[in-house]
C-alpha cells in the first residue's frame, strides 16, 4: 500500500524460500478500473496447466461505503517468469456482492474448477466449467462459538493435495479481533466434506512484529508452498511485514 492508501501488488523472489533475492521497485499489478480504484489486495496464485490464475480482492468506496469483491485474472507462467506482465482480462465472479478470501484449487475436481471464498460469515465453495461463470455456491464451514475462529474465517493459500485429502490453511478471527491460522482437511473427491479441522490454531500472533503494526494482533496468509515434506506458509504480520513459517507436513494434518 502506498502513501495514497491504494493497494497494489508487487513481486519478490527467493531461491531458498526464506531470504529475498530480488524485489522489484514498481508494482506488477495495480488498479485499472472503477471497481478496484481503491486497491487490489490479498492476491492468491494457483498454477493450472502452465497458467497462473490470480484471485484478489478488488476494493472501491462509494458514498463512504466500502465494497470489496473477489476478482480473477491470469498470466502465462512463462510470462510471469520472464517478468512480462501480460495479465489477461479481469473478471468479477460475483459482481456487486461483498465477498473476499478466494482461492482456486490446483486441478479440476469431477471435471470442474473449484474455488473457496467467503460469503460472510462462512467459507464457501463454488464451481466453474471455464473459470468465468461460477455456480453452486455452498457453505463448507463457518466460525465456531467461543473459539479462536469465532468471529469470522477465510481461506489462506492454495489447497495442498495429499493422499489423505486437501490440506487447506485458513485464517480465523476471535471475538477479540485476533487473527490466527488453522487447518482443515477436505475430501479429495468431494471438497464440501470436512475430514478434520484443527481445534487450536497452528500460528497465532506472539512476536512483536505480529502484535504491533498497522493492524495489531494479526497473522494473515495468502500463500503457501509445499517443499518435499515441509510446508512454507507466507503471511503478513500486523499488516506491516512479510513473514514465513516452516512446518513439517505431519504437524499440519489435523487429528480427526
Regions found by a protein language model. Give the residues of each.
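Electrostatic interaction modules used in gene-expression and signaling proteins
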Residues: 224-226
